[in-house]
Amino acid sequence: MSLLVVFIGLASFASFGDYINPNLDVTEVRASHILVKTRPEAVKIRKEIVNGDISFEDAAEKYSLCPSSVNGGDLGYFKRGQMVQPFSDVAFDLKVGQISDPVGTKFGWHLIKVVDKR
């Protein structure tokens, strides 16, 4: 019974996986994204951003179908695996400030910009 109490106490302190493996990757990414229906739309928007015709945030507000568009596409911080694949993998592979090529998911086509990592 005391082992159960210890386990429950530890579970409330940290997730079981974090307790078992203290070297677990806890890196979080803060990313913004633009969600559109088609790959050609995403390619066109990315070109506008890269050419300096529009900022990523303004493009998100103008084009994105996601409710995050009102915040410039900001999704906040998230851990690996918390977002749909391959979105999550691409976000974690990008460097801060980098904008992805179009990424297809079941929701549509995304442009991802990593804002911060911690």
Region spans (language model):
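Peptidyl-prolyl cis-trans isomerase
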Residues: V50-Q85
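Second-shell loop/turn segments in exported
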Residues: R30-I34, V43-V50, D74-Y77, Q98
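Short alpha-helical scaffold segments that flank and stabilize functional sites
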Residues: I45, K62-Y63, L94
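Proteostasis/folding factors centered on peptidyl-prolyl cis-trans isomerases
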Residues: L3-L35, P86-R118
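Short, flexible coil/turn micro-motifs enriched in small/turn-prone residues
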Residues: K47, P67-N71, F92, V103
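A generic structured-segment signal
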Residues: K44-E48, D58, D89-V90
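Solvent-exposed coil/turn segments that connect beta secondary-structure elements
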Residues: I34-E41, L65-C66, R80-M83, V114-R118
